[in-house]
From Swiss-Prot:
Annotated protein name in UniProt: Superoxide dismutase [Mn] 2, mitochondrial
Family membership noted in the UniProt record: Belongs to the iron/manganese superoxide dismutase family.
Intracellular or extracellular location(s): Mitochondrion
Tagged with keyword Transit peptide: yes
Native source species: Caenorhabditis elegans
Lineage, top ranks: Eukaryota, Metazoa, Ecdysozoa, Nematoda, Chromadorea
Functional summary from the UniProt entry: Destroys superoxide anion radicals which are normally produced within the cells and which are toxic to biological systems.
Amino acid sequence: MLQSTARTASKLVQPVAGVLAVRSKHTLPDLPFDYADLEPVISHEIMQLHHQKHHATYVNNLNQIEEKLHEAVSKGNLKEAIALQPALKFNGGGHINHSIFWTNLAKDGGEPSKELMDTIKRDFGSLDNLQKRLSDITIAVQGSGWGWLGYCKKDKILKIATCANQDPLEGMVPLFGIDVWEHAYYLQYKNVRPDYVHAIWKIANWKNISERFANARQ
């Protein structure tokens, strides 16, 4: 029985071992703007802390966790590999979410492309309705999390969703995310999350969102 269990564990970790055999370190991406460029919507101080401290921590933790996972898998320690999954999801999700978030923002974000605007009108009635619905569900997130506009490739429609903590968006291609962890706004907006969420639309990078939409439809 023990030998059978060991063989099963070995088979389970072998595919992961192959993936981890060639690996590289994750790095903190540069911002596509200066820290002060999004003022007055988001202050220089918030942007610098958010990027250099919070996102950097997710990246550093992710690299450390992947090293531990590699070690566990190489030793055939399935129990340890499984135990690392929550931390991998949290820090990996934090890195993924923030890497999208930075590109979603711009001082002069323009307007949605014609194709995206037509789809917004089809699926939500109007851009105003989309903004209101996404804002409402994002403001209502309990604790920390994200609000997302995504594209469902299966149904070929735009959808909105929320994710707790740093869980990455699943079942859709992420187009635009709103970070409602307090570190994203508290120094400036205090506990008035609605003001922050409503204001962030002023710096939505519609060029980036439209490009993501076009790529998702391919």
